Design a protein with these regions (language model features):
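Ferredoxin-type iron-sulfur electron-transfer modules in oxidoreductases and energy-metabolism complexes
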Residues: 17, 35-56, 73-99, 144-163, ...
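Hydrophobic alpha-helical positions that pack around
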Residues: 118, 246-372, 384
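Gly-rich Lys/Arg/Thr-decorated short loops/hinges at beta-loop-alpha junctions or inter-strand turns
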Residues: 129-144, 193-207, 310-315, 357-362
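Histidine-anchored nucleotide/phosphate-binding helix
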Residues: 214-228
């Protein structure tokens, strides 16, 4: 006799897979409310029938859209932005978790023209992954460069970096491979690798975004450098104004140690290397490599005379690699893909990509990573969208507070080291600060001298005293006191600072001053600002009044 089956059918619904939502943890996004948006999303979806996995990723670099919320869909990640906490309820009602339509919907993020036109090499993972997730890092190509490097003799690693054409991204543009070989050729047993993360130039934020958005990449680059030159210890020197970057790098180092990416016998290779974070005290001069080394040693940040260079006698008198964040962060990609793949990007002696940072009076500020050779006009118009104020662009300062002011007639310059040097300018760290037609260029020239006088370490007279005299002379010029004579004095002073200063602090301060006088001379032909009225005119700001 057959017993009837009385088991009730299973009518329970299987648990739904969580929907992945991304909200940046980058400090720029946090400054405009990303944390509150993340909290609102978690609160609104808690206990719902659609489980949500919230990932705090880095920023994509489209800063005018922050906080940028992304939702993973079968078609790809759909973006919404800029999102405020008050928008969350409406977004969820409109089907946010399915990529639904809404006025803030931007479409598939990877297809947005701002991103689609770029060559993201160094920034390939930033904004895509959870910065402190080792699984994310490995899933997106992490450690490929280090594993390749560890299979090669140190000399071949240096050859690969040299053949790639990688130059220092901190401003000087010195070939990275040459610096590495100099350190490797030193016989000292104790050597160091130092990452200069004292990003103090106005309008620059790429180093911060790397540290906050892809810290393992930077650790990987430092470890490759250590293998190449025989170093066992390295330091990050991070400016105190970057607390989020400091916290992220410290957390990443601890995680790397637990996964044997740092410490003894790294990945079974026999390499021993460890990293430490040191926080600067806020001095701009410590962005200069020898001042940074002085600060790392616990001393006041002052410039060291050269020679000897740090590659021969650096930290604690030992051979030391000092490279910028972007330089070291690019090394893993070069080792993973090969020197030729990187060398094929760019133009002339400027190979690979540069991370341009658009700031100042600009409609769409953010990160643009593209091959060298793009023009300044393309960056300003195609990416930046003109000024935030809606007024015409009058000038752009490229390369930080010591960079030249470029007029509209030079906006078709290709963005590469040689073209800028020929034009009397420099690329620097890739920062662009935009000014509209209301800017007073005499005031900007004065500011360059004033900035130098405040930030000078004081070690050399041309910088320490010359910058103070520069402020005084410019004040006399715009006040109408013996203009021609004082312009001649200013020119002589600029020559003295350029030729006599110990470092680029005093040596480059004349660059913005001279460019302002050369390209915007009308701004120096008006009476002083005391009691005067500024009015806009087609060429810039004029000061009305009698002389």
């Amino acid at each position: 006799m057959t017993t009837p089956d009385t088991t009730a059918p299973d009518t329970t619904t299987p648990p739904k897979s969580p929907v992945t939502v991304y909200v940046p943890r980058d400090s720029a996004a946090r400054s405009v409310g990303a944390d509150a948006v993340a909290d609102a999303l978690l609160s609104a979806t808690a206990g719902g029938d659609r489980p949500v996995e919230l990932v705090r990723n880095g920023s994509r670099g489209m800063l005018w859209l922050e906080p940028l919320v992304e939702v993973a869909t079968p078609e790809g990640r759909v973006g919404y932005g800029p999102v405020a906490p008050s928008d969350v309820a409406d977004l969820l009602a409109a089907g946010l978790l399915d990529g639904g339509d809404h006025p803030l919907r931007l479409g598939l993020v990877e297809e947005l023209p701002w991103l689609a036109r770029q060559n993201r090499v160094t920034f390939a993972r930033i904004g895509v992954t959870d910065p402190l997730s080792t699984e994310d890092y490995l899933r997106h190509g992490g450690l490929e460069g280090l594993r390749t490097a560890l299979r090669l003799p140190p000399a071949e690693v240096i050859d690969t970096v040299t053949e790639s054409g990688l130059r220092g991204r901190g401003g000087a543009g010195f070939p990275a491979g040459v610096k590495w070989k100099t350190v490797a050729d030193c016989a000292d047993e104790l050597k160091f690798v130092c990452c200069n993360a004292d990003e103090g130039d106005s309008g620059t934020f790429a180093d911060r975004m790397v540290m906050e958005g892809d810290p393992f990449m930077l650790i990987e680059g430092m470890t490759i450098a250590a293998h190449a030159v025989g170093a066992r210890e390295g330091y990050f020197y991070i400016r105190s104004e970057y607390p989020d970057a400091v916290a992220t790098m410290r957390a990443a180092i601890e995680i790397a140690r637990t996964h044997n990416w740092l410490g003894e016998d790294i990945l079974g290779s026999g390499l021993t290397f460890d990293l430490h974070v040191r926080v600067g005290a806020g001095a701009y001069i410590c962005g200069e490599e020898t001042s940074m080394l002085e600060s790392l040693e616990g001393k006041r940040g002052t410039v060291r005379p050269k020679p000897p260079i740090p590659a021969v006698e650096g930290l604690f008198g030992k051979p030391t690699i000092v490279n910028n964040v972007l330089t070291l962060a690019t090394v893993p990609v070069i080792l993973a893909r090969g020197a030729r793949a990187y060398q094929e990007l760019g133009t002339g002696r400027s190979r690979g990509t540069q991370v341009f940072q658009l700031g100042g009076n600009i409609a769409r500020g953010g990160i643009v990573e593209t091959a060298f050779g793009i023009t300044l006009r393309e960056l300003l118009e195609d990416y930046g969208g003109g000024t935030f104020s809606g007024r015409p662009v009058r000038t752009v300062q490229v390369g930080g507070p010591l960079g030249a002011y470029l007029p509209e007639s030079q906006f078709d310059l290709p963005m590469d080291y040689e073209a800028f040097a020929e034009a009397g300018a420099m690329l620097g760290h890739g920062g662009l600060v935009v000014f509209d037609d209301t800017v007073d260029m005499a005031a900007q020239a004065r500011f360059a001298m004033e900035f130098c006088s405040v930030e000078s370490c004081g070690k050399c007279t041309p910088c320490r005293i010359g910058s103070v005299r520069g402020v005084e002379v410019i004040d006399r010029i715009v006040a109408g006191e013996d203009r021609d004579d004082n312009l001649a004095v200013l020119e002589d002073l600029c020559d003295l600072m350029t030729d006599g200063s110990l470092c680029a602090m005093g040596g480059l301060t004349p660059m913005p001053v001279r460019s302002a006088i050369t390209h915007f001379s009308d701004d120096f032909l008006v009476r002083g600002t005391r009691g005067a009225v500024h009015t806009a005119h087609p060429g810039g700001t004029r000061t009305e009044g009698t002389t």
